[in-house]
Amino acid sequence: MEDRIKISILMDYYRELLTEKQKYVMELYFNQDLSLAEISELTNTSRQAIYDIIKRCNKLLVDYEKKLNLARKNKELIKAKQIIIEKINDLEYSNNKNDFKNSLEDIKNTIVQYI
């Protein structure tokens, strides 16, 4: 189940790097949850060919992520955004000038670290 979720996420990032047939098969298999037999019937292709396409695409998507890291970078940006929002919220309730400066410094460090 976890692998299916991972591949679905990678499809969101790298779908356009696949051929039209690969996109179609992956869409049917992962998003519409069709079996290999159902996909092979729809595409007039052997079940083994569909299996091979899915395996090849899985490897391609993982390789793209290893090289480009788009999913990982996006996850880091979301984390940085959450940290910055939390620090800004802390600033709203800070009456102490030192706390204010420290929070600003934390925000700067977060921006430098993640962005």
Curated annotation (Swiss-Prot):
<protein>
    <recommendedName>
        <fullName>UPF0122 protein NT01CX_2214</fullName>
    </recommendedName>
</protein>
<dbReference type="InterPro" id="IPR007394">
    <property type="entry name" value="UPF0122"/>
</dbReference>
<comment type="similarity">
    <text>Belongs to the UPF0122 family.</text>
</comment>
<dbReference type="InterPro" id="IPR054831">
    <property type="entry name" value="UPF0122_fam_protein"/>
</dbReference>
<dbReference type="InterPro" id="IPR036388">
    <property type="entry name" value="WH-like_DNA-bd_sf"/>
</dbReference>
<dbReference type="Pfam" id="PF04297">
    <property type="entry name" value="UPF0122"/>
</dbReference>
<comment type="function">
    <text>Might take part in the signal recognition particle (SRP) pathway. This is inferred from the conservation of its genetic proximity to ftsY/ffh. May be a regulatory protein.</text>
</comment>
<dbReference type="InterPro" id="IPR013324">
    <property type="entry name" value="RNA_pol_sigma_r3/r4-like"/>
</dbReference>
